[in-house]
Every structure is written in structure tokens, then in C-alpha cells.
Amino acid sequence: MTADLSSPRRARRSPSSYLGALVGKTIRRSIPTAIAFFVLLGIWQLLCSGENAACRPIQVVQESWDLIIDPFYRGSGTDQGLFWQIAASLQRVAVGYLMAAIAGIALGILIGVSVLMFQALDPIFQVLRTVPPLAWLPISLAAFRDSQPAAIFVIFITAIWPIIINTAVGVQNIPQDYNNVARVLKLSRLDYFLKVLLPATVPYIFTGLKIAIGLSWLAIVAAEMLTGGVGIGFFIWDAYNSGSNSEVILAIIYVGLVGLLLNALVGFIASRVVPDEQK
């Protein structure tokens, strides 16, 4: 008697079973986060359990309930719901971040491929990147005479440095074997850029972009506290001046969640662009 050694054909999974497995996997991954969240809430409640303690979790929800249930409220001037406050901040971040990405990648490649440019510009970049973001705000206000472009400039000058540095490091770390093959094949500069330099540098570029998006969101919240207008930063500052600590805490939570989503968005794009063997 001979045994049938042929492997059984794998049954094709239905869309419903695949969706169920995905949901189950997501729930299992979320359990530790949920436990940590409730532990932090408990610690928060205990720390604010004195007779005169303020800003208990329940109190924050009660006092800021209108902002929670109506984020799309539209009033006059800066009297806007949290959705519009965050949207205004995100708009400034998007413009400044996009400008920083374009300029940062270009400059990073330039100083990465040219030893002379690296020696000339790297010391300047190292000095400028240590300047705190808000230190640029008075200069930008004096130059642009408007809070909107001034805030965008602060985003730009904050986000550009990690992009430049990581891109340059990526170019400098291209394996020498790649360059040797390019010389043997006599690739043109354009072909070398598209087929060798860019693919090898993409992981480093996205590392810089991921760092930059977090710094951009951090900087715009701080800058808006000084520039005013519609934006989550000025909302926090205005709530503080009004003595509404619950609104301040709620806004801080929203800021953290948006920052998490921005970081996840850049990470998701990187997972689709960066080849698996380079991750």
C-alpha cells in the first residue's frame, strides 16, 4: 500500500473569515493598551481625590462635555469647535511640512553626494538645528508681518533638519557595490538617481519624515499660543487664561491623539513605499 504524499490543497478563506481574523487580531493587540489606559485613569483619579482637587477625569468630561459632543461648532472669530481648531493647525502643518520635505530631501541628497557641499554646509546645519523652534518666531513675525506665514515658517524650520540629516546619511551609506555596478553599466545620472540612489535612500528619508512630523505638530501647538487665531495651540492658551483647566486637559488629549495618527500615517506610507528587504 502506498501512502498519498501529496499535500492537501489549502482552502480559500472567505472575506468574512478574513475580516473576523483581522478584527480578532486587532482586539488582542489592543488589550494591553486598554489595560494601561484604565490603570492611568485610576491613578489620575486617585491623585485628584482630595477635597479641593480639581481636574478629575469625570470632572473633565462633565465640564467640557459641550466640546466633546459638538466638535463641529462654528462661532465667530476664534469661537470654534475642536475639529476646526485642529483642522486649522493641521493645515499650517501640512504646508510647512510639505515645504520642509521637498527642500530637506533635495538638500540632503546634495550634501550626501558632494563631499565639498557636506564640508561647507553640515556645520551650518548642525548649528541651526539646535535653535529652539520658538526662537525663530520673532524673526518670522518681523519678516512676514503676519501670524499665518510666520507659523508656517516655524514648522518649516523645525521639520527640515531631521529630513536633511537622515537623507544625507542614507546617500552616504549607499553600498559601494551598488556604485560599482552603476559604473560598470555606465548608468546616466538620471538612471543612477532613479535606480540606485533613491531606492537605497528611501528608508532613511522616511525615518527623517517620521521624526519631522512629530516635531512639526509639537512646534505648531507652541507657536499658536503666541500667534493667536484659530488653532489648537491658541485654544489651549485661551482656555488657560479663562481658568478652564478641563478644556486644557481635553485639548492636550486631542493633541496627543492627532500626533499619534500623524505618526501612524507616515509609518503606513513608509510601509507601502519602503521595500520589505530594507525595513
From Swiss-Prot:
This is Nitrate import permease protein NrtB. PROSITE patterns: ABC_TM1. Its main location: membrane. The complex is composed of two ATP-binding proteins (NrtC and NrtD), two transmembrane proteins (NrtB) and a solute-binding protein (NrtA). The keyword Transport applies. GO terms for biological process: monoatomic ion transport; nitrate assimilation. GO terms for cellular component: plasma membrane.
